[in-house]
Amino acid sequence: MNKQKLLIVGGGGMVGATAAYACALRSVIEEIVLIDRNEDLAWGQAADINDAMGIDRNVVVHTGNYSDINDDDIVVITAGTPQLPGQTRLELIDVNAKIMRDIVKNIMANGAKPYLVIVSNPVDVLTYVALKESGLPKNRVFGTGTTLDTSRMKSYLADAFNVDSKAVDAYILGEHGDSSFSTIETAQIGEVPIREYPGFAEEMIDGIEQKVRERAYRVIETKKSTYFAIGFVVSKIVSALRKSTHTVYPVCSLAEGEYGLNNVVLGLPSTISSDGVKILAGYPLTEREKESLNKSAGIIAKMISHLDKAENC
């Protein structure tokens, strides 16, 4: 029986390499394989990470190819193209959907049944593409969803209330994009409702979603891209996939009836374990949050419909 390993498609890029580095630092898996069209760059990233592990090495990082994928391996896909000046979002979706289809075809070519974790953007739509192209069960294909958005919000609230971010219980849900929304109305710090927490002021949470987005935009403006935060998110997800503890993160996977949604992929509270992903049904949402969820789902559904029509033309 093959030992489970992590393979990162796009491992030569900053997101893929940083995800590999985070996984290696945290020792979440023993073998990491970087796959990239630029084989020299992938080799350099793998060598650099291995050198970092030299003093206390319990993880091996190396380059490889699609034929290295076996049943139950974890394949993280970070490859894709960024949005160009003047390019519409639908045009970007068309380009990255083609890239995703080609990657998934290569992944599935040897008949293995891995887990697919999508990081490439727009992550909700590309997760749908990967699921459809792979033919894998829906519990084996999911994206990072709004996990990074949630991490940003928890970091912001932890600073505002001067608490450990682990004490903050709140999510950003929906699209990993401009229609995302927070569950701030039912948020808690420890087990205390946020509005009852000592020192609470309404301005602390007013417009929290926009503040989270502006934080992301500011990071991109100053350093062109984000990779440390999403790399760490990937390491947490990979770790959860290797355990039976059913860790909850707002990843994106196919909804089939949950929260009244069908045939749409977006960030929802979900359990992740060695059994894969499962949407956590029944998470309490306010009426405002339900409206926001349906609005976000509608936006993603239109993008999915656009892709389905384009593919059938």
Residue ranges and their predicted role:
Residues 2-6:
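Extreme N-terminal starter segment of soluble prokaryotic enzymes
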Residues 12:
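Conserved glycine-rich cofactor-binding loop
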Residues 29-33:
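Short beta-strand element of Class I
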Residues 35-72, 87, 301-308:
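Conserved N-terminal Rossmann-fold NAD(P) cofactor-binding segment
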Residues 54-115:
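Rossmann-like NAD(P)-binding element
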